[in-house]
Design a protein with these regions (language model features):
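Glycine-rich phosphate-binding loops of nucleotide-dependent enzymes
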Residues: 2-167
Length: 167
């Protein structure tokens, strides 16, 4: 519903916008979320409505875009464990059925549906308690839309994700 404030509510829960009123409870406990870092520490992830402006680094690789939120898991001292990063990237390329010639492909060169799959996979890699999807099939073709919904349904059935529609 355009103009209903749906995206603003989602962004407030994720700490991108200040909330004007109310409290956020997670697993029965009140949590304070003033930034995306606070949200992520509480296991909340957001796939934004506009992936190109708010979600992706279009000139960067599929690998970079897949792992940027979990990069700290691959750091050993001052080095990045590239093999572990490639392994996680491939895991989510496979899980999301992303079509890409390589992990090093610039994400801006992929179709909208494959860009969206990488973005959803990025946030799934954080193992969130709550995954907020703001219009996850916006700007993708019918085939990709169907694939994204099938993946979401599979995640719900396996118990990895709880899904709520906000409208």
């Amino acid at each position: 519903m355009v103009g209903a404030g749906r995206s603003e509510v989602m962004k407030s829960i994720f700490g991108l916008m200040p909330k004007s009123t109310g409290d956020i409870y997670l697993e029965g406990k009140k949590v304070t979320i003033n930034s995306p870092i606070d949200a992520m520490k509480n296991g909340i992830a957001l796939v934004p409505e506009n992936r190109k402006l708010e979600g992706l680094y279009l000139v960067q690789s599929v690998r970079f875009n897949s792992t940027i939120e979990v990069l700290n898991e691959f750091i050993k001292g001052i080095f990045v464990d590239n093999s572990k990063e490639r392994e996680i990237t491939q895991e989510y390329i496979d899980k999301m059925a992303t079509k890409t010639p390589s992990q090093e492909q610039a994400i801006g060169n992929l179709s909208g549906g494959n860009q969206q799959k990488v973005l959803i996979g990025r946030w799934l890699a954080t193992h969130p308690k709550i995954l907020i999807l703001d219009e996850p099939t916006r700007g993708v073709d019918v085939g990709a839309k169907s694939e994204i919904y099938a993946i979401m349904n599979k995640l719900v059935k396996t118990g990895n994700v709880n899904y709520y529609d906000i409208f």
